[in-house]
Structures are given as structure tokens and as C-alpha cells.
Amino acid sequence: MSGAAAFGNIFRIPELKKKVFFTLSLLVVYRIGAHIPTPGINSVALAEIMSRMTGTMMGFFDMFSGGALSRLTIFALGIMPYISASIILQLMTMVSPYLARLKKEGEQGQKKITQYTRYGTIVLSLVQSTGISVGLEAMRSPTGNAVVLEPGWSFRIMTVLTLTAGCAFLMWLGEQITERGIGNGISLIIFSGIVAGTPAAIFQSMDLMGTGELSVFIMLFLMFFMAAVVGMIVFTEGGQRRISIQYAKRVVGRKMMGGQSSHLPLKVNTSGVIPPIFASSIIMFPATIAQFTTHPWMQNISAMLTPGTFVYSLIFIGAIFFFCYFYTAVIFNPVDVADNMKKHGGFVPGIRPGAKTSTYIDEILSKITFYGAIYLSLVCILPDYLIRYVNIPFYFGGTSLLIIVGVSLDTMQQLESHMVMRNYDGFMKKGKLKGRQG
């Protein structure tokens, strides 16, 4: 079935149509809020300063906030404080017996963890917005104009409250999209911010070509390179390692059950776009505060954490590897999978059911997660090095491409599952996912 026909099927399912329109309407609200300025800011002076931040961590953060940071709007903090709080809570579940118990309590326990994540988001937002408000008062544009019109405690309090409230509202939007809409709300908010800034980045690149700062040959090469990166993302995101499963025959009543074979699909990139987003959040939090301060040692930290530098790349790759394994362990438990297989009479040929099977699955998962982490690191880092030396906007970086393609694929898969469940054809053909049998 063609993509247009599959797209039309969305509007033939009332519940799905409602979810899609609900998601789009909340994303529109987000984009409107990304243009409402914070009170007390000299927008002209701020624009002069931010225009010189291209290629720095500030420019990278601005990409994730959908341009809200460069305009210092009510959503300037973006959704990163929420992501940072989520990381902290998930890490604490590994060392805190209380949080570990909550995690095992199912839905009620998860509600409490979510509540603690919200509290953590507010705390991190207060810290980050305080650093930004104090730093803004010391900032002056290249022409000597002050960024803050009336410095003082009234401006600081107003800015802290505005930015914190904006982040809390974005957190609520993301949760509403996840619960009542289509796709992961937090990922879609980041996705929509990047997509919204893409046209401006394209026009900026065209202006560079017009002034001769960027040759046509280099631009064509970059377009080909980005197309290759997108192709690599689509190809790898669909990759699977399939573990063969055989079900033993058994008599249930008067019927002979089982005997059929199946497989357990393990994605090459089980964790999706989460590791790069988490890694970016970890680096952005201190780098953003450092960028808004005038202390030399803080400025050195900000310079070291600029995308494309060796220190940034080392920390970013290390964080990607860590979160690949960590998040995969959070969403996939080989012990539970092996136990469920054993209960239903399933087994991996040549492997004893139970502990041996869980160990076998865990070993395979660890290997493909390693390759998945290498893939994510290459996609995120290599384009940034290329772009750093060609002076192309960061909207064309590897992380942004990965988020755009990855979130698009995840959202399409959710739409697909809704349509197939109601006996409608979806976007993807059967058997499209490739895998290695094992």
C-alpha cells in the first residue's frame, strides 16, 4: 500500500485520529510558547550575542530548545532539566533500596518515581535558571548594549520563576502526549524543536553559499553525506538479531498444544535515541551555566565542552556507551524473558531453559548493544567534526539527524500498530525488518 493511502487510514480510525490531533495541538502550543519572550530582556543585544554562539555548546542547547534559548523565551530551558532528573532517578534506583522497591511495585511505584522526577525537574530548573539570570546581568553585546534592561533581584526572581514554570509546563505537555497522544512526548518535543529550526538553517547555508563562504561542491558533498547518514540510521534501526525459539508439545485437555517454532527479536539499537539525548543532557547542564558566567575557569569549561572538541567527544562517547547498556537493562530483562519462555514451554535449541537461557540471551544482548553504541557514537560524532570545520549550522549535526529519523520511525511504528490492530494497512511492509537468525 502507498504511503498516502496508509496516511489516509489514520483518519478512518476515530480514536487514532483523536490521538494524532491531540499530539499536534500540544506541539503547536509548545511552538507558540517558544516565541513568548522572558520579561526584562533587550532582545536586540541578546540576538547580537547569540549570533556569535554558533558552533558552541550554547548553539547545541539552542537546537534542543527549538531556538527558545537564543530568544530567551519562557521555554528557554527546554525539556533538558526533566531528562536530567529522569537520569538521576533511574541511577538512584540502582543504589537506593527504597527506590528499587518502588520500581518493583508496578504502576503505583512508578507513579511515585514519576512524582520524584517532577520534584527533581523543578530543583534543577531553579539551579539552571538562577545561573542564567545572574549571568545575563553581566552580559553585553559587541556594541556595548546590556542584555538586561533593569538588573537586580526583581529581574532575577522573575526570570527564575518564568523559566522554571516554562520547564514545568513543557514537562506536563510531554507527559500528556505520552499518555493521551501518539509517540513519546519528551522525544517529540525535542524533535519538533529541531524540525522547526531546520528551514532557518537551510537558508543560513544558502546565504553562506551566496557570499562565497561555502562552495557549491562542499554543500553537495555535505548533502550526500547527510543522506548517507540518514540511510545508515534507517538501516541500522531496523536491524535485529533473532534468537530461535522452539515450543515443546504438550497435551492440554484433549488437544496437543505447542510444537511450533518462533523467534525472539533483539534490536541492534534497543535503546533507540535515548542514549544521545541523555548524554547531551548530562553535558549541557554544566555547560549552559558555564556559558552564562564571566569567570575565566568557567569559560574554559564551556570551551572544552563545545561539540567537535576532543574532551566533548570523549565524554559524549563514554556517556553514550554507558546509557546504551544502562537503558537496555532498564527496558529489557533477560531473566524475565527466560522465565516466561519456560512457563510457556519454550526453549532455545541447545540451551537449557531457565538460568542458562537468560545468560545466553544476556550475552547476545551485550554484544549487539556494544555494536549499537558504536553506531550511535559514529552517527553523532563524525558529522559534528565535519560540520565544525565547514561552518555549517548544528541543525545538520549527527545528533539532530538521529533524533529526527529515530523519533519519526518510532512514531510511525506506533501508528502502524494502531492501524494493524484495527485491520488497516500501515506504512511498513511485512518482513521489512532484517535480522540475523541465531
What annotation goes with each model-predicted range?
Residues M1-K103, Q108-G438:
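N-terminal cationic and glycine-rich segments that engage phosphates or anionic surfaces
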